[in-house]
């Protein structure tokens, strides 16, 4: 019995993501799964695409984006899909769209406007953000970081030109735990920016430790990328 597939992409240079050299061949797709890689000439399909020698590869992961809001506003994500990107990591540089509710009593510190204005920060929890994403799924996968600057701005009510108090750190740690339990992959910081510049290492470490208990990672935009680069890393 002849093997069947929905889509065949043939006459391609196949890069399979294992580190192996590209090889001539193709892939077969059935439903939402790749069901064969390599010689697909004997497989029948309702739709066959001649790649004309172009590369067929796994989707790319864009590991540094600020796509938090774009994922909701433009779920087709043509800006990524047309580049071969199928997964984005957002919430970088200490700025995430959630968990954060702004106040009319204080201004959002720099660089919070990177993701939008006060009206666009409308998710009091990461869980609320995740539900909005699930309601209108984007065309790409998303791995989300919880932003230290976002946490600081809310916990300190915009008064970010100082270290956080023990109580404020405890509030941020609680938010990190809630965010990790709702599906985030870790915490990010943007220590070069006004919102995070005055945070001592101990404050950042406290949040990274909270994420680490869930297997989360820590990503940073360093305090300095020039003369004090080595000091920033240390």
Question: Where are the model-predicted features located?
Answer:
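Catalytic cores and adjacent flexible loops of soluble metabolic enzymes
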Residues: 70, 125, 146, 222, ...
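Divalent metal-coordination and catalytic microenvironments
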Residues: 12, 27, 32, 53, ...
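Histidine/acidic residue-rich metal-binding segments in metalloenzymes
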Residues: 128-129, 163-189, 195-234
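Active-site environment of divalent metal-dependent phosphoester hydrolases
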Residues: 68-71, 95-98, 152, 193-196, ...
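Histidine-rich, glycine-flanked metal-binding segment
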Residues: 1-8, 14-59
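Divalent-metal coordination cores built from histidine and acidic residues
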Residues: 73-185
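Hydrophobic faces of well-ordered beta-strands that scaffold small-molecule active sites
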Residues: 61-65, 88-90, 142-146, 187-189, ...
């Amino acid at each position: 019995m002849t093997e069947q597939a929905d889509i065949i992409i043939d006459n391609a240079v196949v890069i399979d993501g294992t580190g192996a050299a590209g090889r001539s061949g193709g892939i077969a797709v059935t439903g939402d799964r790749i069901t064969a890689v390599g010689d697909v000439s004997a497989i029948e399909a309702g739709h066959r695409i001649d790649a004309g020698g172009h590369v067929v590869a796994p989707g790319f992961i864009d590991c540094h984006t600020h796509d938090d809001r774009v994922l909701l506003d433009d779920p087709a994500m043509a800006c990524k899909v047309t580049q071969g990107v199928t997964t984005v990591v957002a919430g970088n540089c200490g700025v995430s769209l959630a968990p954060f509710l702004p106040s009319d009593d204080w201004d959002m510190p720099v660089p919070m406007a990177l993701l939008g204005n006060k009206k666009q920060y409308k998710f009091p929890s990461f869980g609320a953000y995740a539900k909005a994403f699930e309601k209108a799924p984007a065309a790409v996968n998303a791995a989300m970081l919880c932003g230290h600057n976002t946490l600081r701005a809310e916990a300190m009510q915009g008064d970010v030109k100082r270290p956080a108090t023990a109580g404020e750190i405890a509030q941020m740690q609680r938010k990190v735990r809630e965010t990790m339990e709702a599906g985030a992959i870790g915490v990010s910081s943007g220590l070069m920016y006004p919102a995070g510049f005055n945070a001592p290492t101990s404050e950042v470490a406290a949040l990274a430790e909270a994420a680490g208990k869930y297997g989360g990672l820590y990503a940073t935009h360093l305090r300095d990328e020039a003369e004090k680069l080595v000091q920033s890393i240390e």
